[in-house]
Amino acid sequence: MTVYHFVGIKGTGMSALAQVLYDLGYTVQGSDVEKWFFTQKALEERGIPVLPFSKDNVHPGYTVIAGNAFPDTHEEIEAARQLSVPVIRYHRFLGELASKFTSIAVTGSHGKTTTTGLLAHVMQGAHPTSYLIGDGTGKGEPGSKYFVFEACEYRRHFLSYFPDYAIITNIDFDHPDYFANIDDVFSAFQQMAQQVKKGIVACGDDPYLQNIQAKVPILFYGLGEENDFQARNIVKTTEGTAFDVFVRNTFFASFTIPRFGTHNVLNALAVIALCHYEGIDAGTIAARLQTFQGVKRRFTEKTVGRQVLIDDYAHHPREIMATLEAARQKYPGREVVAIFQPHTYTRTQTFLSEFAESLQQADYVYLCDIFGSAREHHGKLSIRDLQEKIPRSQLLEEQNVSVLKQHRDAVLVFMGAGDIQKFQHAYEQAVLSA
């Protein structure tokens, strides 16, 4: 049997895929940079070897799975070609793997990681289910019929997939380094929808998704009355959110989720609709929704002294609004402080005004330097351009995080898709050593 060697095994998707293959009984190893990433923990727990990059890592009889960040000129990929070892890109391999199961792709501009994790958790309550989540978590369940996986629209990678079912959470303009505009994004999702084999569950509150064409039935969910699955009587508390679900205007069941913000009602509704379609009973769905622990880097909370620290992946204005709304729901009456690190110069430039508007939902705003992508040039843009648009906002550096101590009893929300976590870690150290 072949050995699967992952070039860039610490990537979130790559790490999750390696875990799935390992669990299914395959021999797996990988290589990456030596810097520690949170995705390593699950690999180390399984005893999956993680090696430094070297052309000597590749041997005849191996199959190389290459991360999308690595060019064909990478030493290990070149070594594989010289040895006639097959090299397959991450998204293509994932497409082939998914075809062996009843596959459910979860996609959309926002909310796909949480929705993938929630769907996998709920379905496991009824059937053995394998899954791959974009937070670096994967599980291969031997004998499983279902495979739930996150499908990313970036560079149209999700066009490598031909799933049985798809959940589409929303369509929004993002990844401006690749997509030209919202119409370009829509065309990618439209093409993906045409590849779904059995059925689509889509958010009917989204104006773009209302215009999606497909060869299979589309079930719409949302808060609007015209949806097939509608959430009504939403009650938000500091413990979570309760709501009733109506299927084509007929009461189906009541649900409670230990999550916050309207976006999480929609994520749960997508999962409820898919599970209903697959014949999972309301009692099982309700019980599993209540025990969902969340996914990594999505509203991950920690109490430090009298403050609550939240780590969140939000890196788009719409995501920032949703995260701050959730913080206000769970901690009403407490000061909410946003600490934001913009991710990529192209995104920061494109959404400069929108970032300023969304961040002003917080009581105080601290800005960290822009986290640039290896693929881009920053030109003249700097974090000060964003600071000028947000009254009373301050710049934050790793060395001066102690300034956050003045916000006693506050909720500190660290947001970004780069290395914002290092600012939180630095702050935690500053508090502990005080």
Swiss-Prot record:
The gene is murC. Pathway: Cell wall biogenesis; peptidoglycan biosynthesis. This is UDP-N-acetylmuramate--L-alanine ligase. GO terms for cellular component: cytoplasm. It comes from the Bacteria. Its main location: cytoplasm. Pfam families: Mur_ligase, Mur_ligase_C, Mur_ligase_M. Its EC number is 6.3.2.8. It is found in: Cytoplasm. GO terms for biological process: cell division; cell wall organization; peptidoglycan biosynthetic process; regulation of cell shape. Cell wall formation. One of its GO terms (molecular function) is ATP binding. It catalyses: UDP-N-acetyl-alpha-D-muramate + L-alanine + ATP = UDP-N-acetyl-alpha-D-muramoyl-L-alanine + ADP + phosphate + H(+). The keyword Cell division applies. InterPro entries: Mur-like_cat_sf, Mur_ligase_C, Mur_ligase_C_dom_sf, Mur_ligase_cen, Mur_ligase_N, MurCDEF_pg_biosynth, UDP-N-AcMur_Ala_ligase_MurC. NCBIfam families: murC (TIGR01082).
